[in-house]
Design a protein with these regions (language model features):
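Gly/Pro-rich turn-and-neighbor structural signature
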Residues: 398-457, 466, 470-473
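Catalytic alpha/beta active-site cores
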Residues: 2-4, 85, 89-405, 412-419, ...
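Short acidic, glycine/serine/threonine-rich loops at helix termini
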Residues: 252-254, 346-351, 404-405, 436-442, ...
């Protein structure tokens, strides 16, 4: 990359590509005066840059003491009570204060009350990002047909009626659990009508009813008045049964059902951190420009396939007619969060008054919130957050002091962008050892804006290895999956989250299923995440989101979480 030209803005030197993007694309339409923006940005860097550096120095100071303590043990068996006292004495393990509940307000239903899958997608890939946003709805027929959920994968690129029949049988068997019928199964339904805005089902000459008729939400018809789909609901998740007698699947189905559309990726994290490499200014501008397209609702992508140009755009919402005859809007897009980088890295895109690189996390905080104003202040069209919030996930924070720092930074950003306090909602990744053991106090530091906590096996075990490197040989990383402490870490995250009042106000998440081709294994195993009381879990693809969504049909996470409220939060970590 050629060396960037820098533009002076107050006490900052800003790489020209970034400066041009902010002044020509991000600021126009945001309602923020450019002079106020640069003044606020400059003051934030001057105030919080030195604090950021001191926090990193404290990390190194604590690590040096822990390594020295282990070296002093010289290989002898560790006395856990002595070790715990040592961690407390150096300020690594902090005392827990009184119980409290979070005060987060104005969260969207997908964050607070509707459990479901969560996608993570690299923000620099517009095509993948659009696919993720549109994965709010996924075809169950396609997901099962194209994966190994049935025990095998397709052996041909041409459609197999035999495999298709197995897919339909699997899907209708799931419908029997999702929305059971009175003395009938979905495979026996032969006619579907809407009569006076109500669902009418038949099996031959026999009328059939839903066991719970309140599960019927509404329907859609085409311009000729022909029924095209009807909508059911369970555990706040919708399912659209699509009808088309002319479709290759529908024409062979006794009720002309051609697909089952599952409400799948309720939320998506668009990622500026682990899944991308945004080192140079041009990389960061690409990331921010795609975020701007999402917040404006106009992100698009084109690619070539088999000699043809394919265009991708964001889906529209879906309007249905309810049993009362009134219209109802179902969201067509996943609710978006954006993951900023943590406190560690600096960026060459902006230099401070001393000519030093500023913290990349500070730049992300300012730029991603500024861009989100295009959604927050929009008066018409499809909004990301109907509650006027922006959701930012902060990764790799070490303990309550670093969470407090992030909270203070967001306070300052809200002030100079002149938006309501706590508009920015924070997600805390519980992936560092000092955060895990002080999780309750971490949550307390962001109690008015926290909207998400999540565990992560790879980063958490990585920090365990790094912190305790001098303690002696470690288990192979893969073997750690089966240790007591990993289970305790996962359980304790849920227990503390619930004890701090996250239920109904925030997400309690579980980590990624990284094996994208092993959907049968995921179908068998990942149901453990909703069973744990967590109300979201990460998935790697729209197909995985569709399959994992079925788990939330089978498990009432809200009910499970109430049972966890009676459990102790001091499980061994």
């Amino acid at each position: 990359m050629a060396k960037s030209e820098f533009i002076i803005k107050k006490n900052l030197q800003v790489a020209k590509p970034l400066c041009d993007f902010l002044e020509m694309e991000a600021l126009p339409g945001s309602g923020v005066d450019p002079n106020i923006f640069w003044e606020g940005f400059s003051n934030l860097v001057r105030t919080y840059g030195p604090i950021n550096k001191k926090l990193l120095e404290k990390r190194a100071f604590l690590q040096k003491q822990i390594s020295a303590w282990h070296q002093k043990q010289n290989g002898k068996k560790i006395d856990l009570s002595e070790y715990q006292s040592f961690l407390g004495n150096i300020g690594y393990l902090l005392p827990e204060k009184d119980d409290f509940e979070i005060e987060t307000a104005n969260v969207d239903p997908e964050i607070g009350v509707v459990p479901g899958p969560q996608l993570v997608v690299p923000i620099t890939n517009a095509r993948y990002t659009i696919n993720a946003v549109n994965a709010r709805w996924g075809s169950l027929y396609d997901a099962v047909y194209g994966s190994d959920v049935l025990g095998d994968t397709p052996n041909s690129s041409t459609y197999s009626p035999e495999r298709g029949a197995r897919v339909v049988a699997f899907s209708k068997a799931h419908l029997d659990k999702f929305a059971p019928l009175v003395d009938c199964t979905w495979s026996q339904i032969s006619k579907i009508l809407i009569v006076d805005n109500l669902l009418s089902l038949s099996s031959g000459d026999k009328k059939v009813e839903l066991l719970d008729q309140s599960q019927f939400v509404g329907y859609r018809s085409n311009s000729s008045g022909v029924l095209t789909e009807f909508v059911l609901i369970k555990n706040r998740l919708h399912c659209r049964i699509v009808i088309d007698a002319n479709d290759i699947i529908g024409k062979s189905d006794p009720a002309n059902i051609c697909d089952v559309q599952i409400e799948a990726a309720l939320t998506t994290i668009v990622d500026c951190e682990d899944s991308v490499a945004t080192v140079d200014t041009e990389d960061k501008v690409l990331a921010y420009r795609n975020w701007l397209g999402l917040m404006k609702g106009n992100l698009s992508a084109s690619f070539n396939k088999a000699g043809s140009t394919i265009n991708r755009n964001l889906n529209s919402d879906i309007q249905i007619i309810t049993p009362t005859g009134a219209p109802l809007i179902l969201k067509g897009r996943s609710l978006l969060l954006v993951r900023n980088v943590g406190h560690l890295m600096t960026t060459p895109s902006i230099l401070d008054e001393n000519g030093d690189e500023i913290g990349e996390g500070l730049m992300d905080a300012v730029c991603t919130v500024l861009i989100a104003l295009h959604d927050i202040k929009r008066q018409s069209g499809i909004k990301n957050s109907t509650m006027g919030s922006v959701y930012i996930v902060k990764p790799k924070m070490h303990g309550p002091e670093e969470v407090r720092f992030a909270n203070d930074v967001f306070n300052e950003v809200e002030k100079f962008l002149q938006i309501t306090p706590n508009t920015v909602k924070m997600g805390i990744m519980d992936e560092e050892r000092r955060t895990s053991i002080n999780l309750k106090e971490c949550i307390r530091e962001a109690k008015s804006r926290i909207a998400f906590i999540n565990t992560g096996f790879l980063d958490r075990t990585g920090d365990e290895i790094h912190t305790s490197m001098e303690a002696g040989p470690m288990l192979p990383k893969n073997d750690m999956k089966f240790t007591k402490w990993i289970k305790a870490y996962e359980d304790r995250n849920v227990d503390i989250g619930l004890a701090c009042g996250l239920q109904g106000k925030a997400q309690i998440g579980k980590g990624m299923w990284a094996m994208t081709d092993l959907m049968a294994d995921m179908w068998e195993q990942k149901i453990d995440h909703p069973k744990s009381g967590a109300n979201c879990a990460w998935v790697p693809s729209p197909t995985a989101a569709t399959i994992h969504a079925l788990h939330y049909h089978l498990v009432n996470v809200t009910a499970v979480s109430y049972t966890h409220l009676t459990l102790p939060t001091n499980r061994e970590v």
